Curated annotation (Swiss-Prot):
Pathway: Isoprenoid biosynthesis; isopentenyl diphosphate biosynthesis via DXP pathway; isopentenyl diphosphate from 1-deoxy-D-xylulose 5-phosphate: step 2/6. Its EC number is 2.7.7.60. The lineage of its organism: Bacteria, Pseudomonadati, Pseudomonadota, Gammaproteobacteria, Lysobacterales. It comes from Xylella fastidiosa (strain M12). The record marks R17, K24 as: Transition state stabilizer. It holds the Pfam family IspD. Keywords: Isoprene biosynthesis, Nucleotidyltransferase, Transferase. This is 2-C-methyl-D-erythritol 4-phosphate cytidylyltransferase.
Amino acid sequence: MSVGVWAVIPAAGRGVRFGSPVPKQYLPVVGRPLIVYTLEALAAHPAVCGLMVVVTEGDLAWSGWTEVAGKPLLTCSGGVTRAASVLSGLLALPQVVHADDFVLVHDAARPNVALSDLERLLEAGCAHPVGAILAVPVRDTLKRAGSDGSIDGTEPRERLWRAFTPQLFRRSQLVRGLQVAAADGIEMTDEAMVMERQGLRPLLVECAESNFKITTPDDLVRFEFELARRV
């Protein structure tokens, strides 16, 4: 993978579901903010040439880092939603990032993406006409619930995947799709959904389950365990 890409990391969320007064991306993990692990995981790939972190305006928790692993780290202010923050990050990218360049978008609270998975995403996504996302096939049995909370049926899982990040798309297509969705008042929960709404079909690239998102305190404990395994 020789083509350089920038990564946009939306980090303007407040982590309401986590139940902490501190946004989860800044929670200390082995003495370091969670987001540092995320940034280092992305910067470890030689094809990632810069990072744009989208923070809340006036974010006092942000430490003002300007580089990671010798690569430039820029910041901009985000919006009320994830989609608005991603759009802000894409528009704030430096001039060296052209309209048709591929850009990675990655969750700030997903600190454990493997270098090998990132490599396969970049290889497959940059060779695909639309782009690609990391994802994991659904392996559990899925039940559909009725309005009373009882089981209403069992859903076939053979073609279902859980969408992870990073997600890799061309900057111009993602910007255009996000702007149209915002104008239409449609909430976009991930970047692949933005592309799907334009009639495009991104590629699914399987990744490790260890690339999970920190959503609950149990997830944080799990990540600490993953860190201990690295030693």
